[in-house]
Regions:
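NAD(P)-cofactor binding segment of oxidoreductase domains
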Residues: 1-26
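Active-site "gating" loop of Rossmann-like NAD(P)-dependent oxidoreductase/epimerase domains
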Residues: 1, 9, 28-52
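Active-site YXXXK catalytic motif of short-chain dehydrogenase/reductase
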Residues: 7, 54, 58, 76
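C-terminal amphipathic/interface module of NAD(P)-dependent oxidoreductases
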Residues: 176-209
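SDR active-site strand-loop-helix element
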Residues: 25-31, 75-77
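Mid/C-terminal beta-alpha module of Rossmann-like enzyme folds, strongest
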Residues: 121, 128-171, 176-177, 183
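NAD(P)-dependent short-chain dehydrogenase/reductase
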Residues: 63-110, 117, 123
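Conserved internal alpha-helix within the Rossmann fold of NAD(P)-dependent oxidoreductases
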Residues: 11-14, 62, 122
Length: 209
């Protein structure tokens, strides 16, 4: 169970070590702690009910952090993308450059979130000395198909006939909606996440130089 060794036991070890030295712990988590069977955005007070091994391991990590270090900030986000590493957005960009049909998972809905924006939010939270669980995803909800279409448009390409829906990942419910409501962020007034389309446009413009 590699997922539990990394996401649960790893988080436990870091939480324990950070408490011993009196350090605040910032723990990054995911929308996958929810099963995606609802029809509304999920806020910090909704019960986490993961339906995948990954989601269960991430929730276990959250629980260890909450139990072992009271000075914690847990940040949940969704469909995070950045220049480095593999992610859904970069996969679509690569396929778009290669031409042909772009394959995306069917009936999955959430909010693509820029790692750059997410990092800016975390820095604001550090400065504000906030604790607890916060959702931090770009505003709005879309399907993976809609996200792929928007990526193509941002690249100056016509998405018509370019997207092929394929079966959802094994072990995940379908349809699946896990877009996060940034309720605590709005209550505290600390930060305002941008609309996912605006953040996507900025990201692709930055890639294109």
């Amino acid at each position: 169970m590699k997922a539990f060794r990394v996401n649960a036991i790893g988080a436990r070890n870091v939480a324990s070590a950070s408490r011993k030295v009196g350090a605040k712990l910032i723990h990054m988590s995911t929308d996958d702690v929810f099963d995606g069977q609802g029809n509304e955005p999920l806020n910090e007070f909704d019960t986490a009910t993961p339906d995948t091994i990954f989601g269960k391991s991430k929730l276990a990590g959250e629980n260890f952090v909450r139990e072992l270090n009271p000075k914690h900030l847990i940040v949940r986000s969704s469909w995070v993308y950045a220049k480095e590493g593999s992610c859904f957005v970069n996969s679509v960009i690569r396929q778009a450059k290669e031409g042909g049909v772009i394959q995306v998972a069917a009936e999955q809905y959430s909010s693509p979130t820029s790692a750059k924006v997410l990092a800016d939010f975390v820095m604001k939270m550090i400065d504000a000395n906030e604790y607890g669980i916060y959702h931090a995803s770009c505003e709005g909800c879309c399907s993976r198909v809609e996200a792929a279409e928007e990526i193509l448009r941002c690249m100056g390409q016509d998405p018509t006939g370019r997207i092929e829906e394929i079966s959802a990942e094994a072990g995940k419910n379908s349809p699946r909606r896990t877009d996060l409501q940034n309720l605590m962020m709005k209550v505290t007034g600390i930060y305002q996440m941008p609309d996912w389309k605006d953040a996507m446009r900025d990201y692709i413009q930055e890639l294109r130089g």
